Design a protein with these regions (language model features):
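Bacterial N-terminal signal peptides
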Residues: 10-21
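N-terminal secretory signal peptides
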Residues: 25-79
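Functional cores of ribonucleases/endoribonucleases
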Residues: 59-129
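Extended, aromatic/histidine-rich regions of cofactor-dependent oxidoreductases associated
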Residues: 3-4, 15, 25, 121, ...
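Bacterial N-terminal signal peptides that target proteins for export
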Residues: 1-11
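Cytosolic catalytic domains that perform sulfur/thiol-centered chemistry
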Residues: 21-23, 84
Length: 129
């Protein structure tokens, strides 16, 4: 009976003594899902023309062509850095030929950062201006 307790205490002690930066190495997938790792970057000039126009509209405060532009983006999959609810807002980037809003969006963060997704929230790239 004392062996399991001793083993458990050893594991607990080892975990407490590990530097916190080593813990990120142990679980990189969890760190990535939590938005800990930096998002890939896309330069403003590399964005599709419609995305550059949408970003200009966001910075001007509108008017926006889609009713759902400006709604809260929940970041439920945690592909962006984790923030409090309401921190992120989403805006539609028109997709030529699409009959609906399409898959492209710009997500605006509360501190002035912007992210582009061309695949309906599967991947994000931070916009570098």
């Amino acid at each position: 009976m004392s062996a399991p307790r001793s083993f458990g205490a050893t594991i607990l002690l080892a975990a407490l003594l590990l530097p916190s930066n080593l813990l990120a190495v142990v679980a990189p997938d969890q760190a990535r899902r939590g938005g800990v790792e930096e998002s890939p970057v896309i330069r403003f000039e590399e964005l599709p023309r419609e995305a550059r126009e949408t970003l200009a509209l966001i910075k001007r405060g509108g008017p926006f062509p889609y009713k759902r532009d400006g709604i809260v983006f929940g970041n439920r999959e945690r592909r962006l850095p984790v923030q409090s609810n309401g921190y992120y807002r989403e805006y539609t980037v028109p997709t030529p030929g699409a009959r609906d809003r399409g898959a492209r969006r710009i997500i605006a963060g509360g501190s002035g950062e912007y992210y582009y997704t061309g695949d309906h929230y599967n991947t994000f790239r931070r916009i570098r201006e």
